[in-house]
Amino acid sequence: SNFDQAVMRKPNRSYRRYQQIAELVNTAVREKADMLVMPEACTPKEWLPTLARTCEKNHLAVVTGVEHIIEDNCVYNLTAVILPYEEKWTGQWHSVILYHSKNHFAPEEKRMIESLHLRAMEGIESSEAKCDAKYELYSWNGFWFTVYCCFELTSIRDRSIFQSYIDAVIAVEWNHDVNYYSNIIESLSRDIHCYCIQTNTSEYGDSRITKPSKTENKDILRIKGGSNATAHVGTIDLEQLREFQMKAYSGQKEDKTFKPTPPDFDYKGAYERRKGTMFEC
């Protein structure tokens, strides 16, 4: 696998692999998608600048797992968030690459790394806050979201911290236990009351966009898997979600577009996301 080759310091940089990623990006551009989400450990770090230039040219945001990086016998698992933006004074488009460092490596992932006398550098070790996991809150074009990398989702504490603050959770995965993660994503969507955008490798499947709604309506898009990586487009309605969240229970019960918001959900968060005033003094 690409992971095995990467940790053995013989990374796959074949033209075929480049073509596969390029086809996903080209499909997103062709379909006029706002954002493309790709799985964990998907994109080599050397290709990120090229990807960023494509993003700024086409006004496309990308969230992608970065292939494991080895520095001084330490292994890092990063997720790149590439956000295009227009410079206010010149009207020129640029893009910024932001990184999330995986806080919790999967046990098997860590075992394979340590079997090669390497050290899995979890985000909690590489950040200033040694005892707490670190996650980021992103705002792009009025869309508030956060990113989790695979095994991080198994932490109840970690996946609950952004309730009321986000429109969506983006989960990048390389995971064979699709049933377990399916249960997590469905619970997370209702507990945090947000959209969940989950992408897994085509080998294992269950990439999806889900919402906190009735079982028969919850999946906006769901892909079982296959031999080839493909890009599919789904649409989320931020205004519809926020308007629902701003209602009291009686109004939500009559609406029925989504499941009611959970206890302790702060409706003011939806109001501030809508107005773009989150964290303003």
Question: Predicted regions span which residues?
Answer:
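Cys-nucleophile CN-hydrolase/nitrilase-fold catalytic domain and related Cys-dependent amidase chemistry
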Residues: 12-100, 175-177, 190-194
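Short, surface-exposed connector motifs at secondary-structure boundaries
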Residues: 30-36, 139-144, 164-169
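Sequence-level detector for tyrosine residue identity
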Residues: 15-18, 76, 85, 99, ...
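Active-site-proximal beta-strand elements of phosphoester/diester hydrolases
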Residues: 1-10, 143-152, 170-172
